[in-house]
Amino acid sequence: MLRDIPFFWRKRCWQSWVLLPLSLIFRALVLLRRQLYRLGVIASYRAPVPVIVVGNVTVGGNGKTPLVIALVNALQEKGWKVGVISRGYGGNRRKPVLVNEKSDVRTVGDEPLLIHQKTRAPVSVYYRRQRAIENLLMHFPETELIISDDGLQHYALQYDCALLAIAADFGLGNGFCLPAGALREPLPPFATIDAIITTGKMSTALPISAPQFVTTFKNDQFYRSNGERISIETLKENPLYVVTAIARPERFLNRLHALGISPVISKIFADHAMLHESMLTFAADGLILMTTKDQVKTQNWSAFWQEKIIVLSDELTIDEELISLILSCATRTRK
């Protein structure tokens, strides 16, 4: 079962019904907040360049970060100067921060650091999206388009294109809002969804009308921390241990099992949790399997442990029609 997702978020049962009154209060507060923005009682910000929001309507583990990375790389290949803004979950900062190769993951957060490492795009981190954008454009005025990592529920930011990321194996859960379900806001979402992107094919229809695209992993390659590729056969010659701190670790474990890999021990920590060498004493005789998101938190590990890190690629395929849709939205709204 999901470590960070209560089982009753998957389908309705007595636990979800007991919590439903709290969900109705949460739902009412969100709807009130929506209406205040819709009426202009609370002001919203429109950036001077197009903004593409990649977000979700359920809590955690929807594959946003690999999707953001794939979109940035695809847009860069077409010649666009792309910047990224992120709240930076797991980080600690009091003002907007630009991510660079030497950034401390404890300050900027694991996802922004990973996005920068995989794309080399400028990434500005702050919980107030307007200030994050202003900081980004002040240092990189040549930026032509901004991707917001998460932010569908950040109503203070106007957008030009909204992409909804959904995990095919979870969908929208039981359809209830927090805490009885996983929904972060009532359906339909406040944002006008321009496209839905799922990691794998959905088994049920979604109650949201928008073009749907399916992404898959490009490959199942494993790499050492220095980027050297390592074969599955070589992996299986060693004791293998999993260390991960992601929202839905069973998805990572299922990929490993599908490749015929059975770890001796799987140590699973809370999403965004920092990883330290002191946690690894059980794995001294083998190799440590982790995700790319986990690897960015090993920057201060000793050479002994760095040499044991093995990362499974999470690079996604991107439909060319999705890129065309994004650019169409961005250019249409800015004419």
From Swiss-Prot:
It catalyses: a lipid A disaccharide + ATP = a lipid IVA + ADP + H(+). Pfam families: LpxK. GO terms for biological process: lipid A biosynthetic process; lipopolysaccharide core region biosynthetic process. Coiled coil: none annotated. It is an enzyme of class 2 (transferase). Its EC number is 2.7.1.130. InterPro entries: LpxK (IPR003758), P-loop_NTPase (IPR027417). One of its GO terms (cellular component) is plasma membrane. ATP binds at T58, V59, G60, G61, N62, G63, K64, T65. The keyword Phosphoprotein does not apply. Belongs to the LpxK family. This is Tetraacyldisaccharide 4'-kinase. It comes from Dichelobacter nodosus (strain VCS1703A). The gene is lpxK.
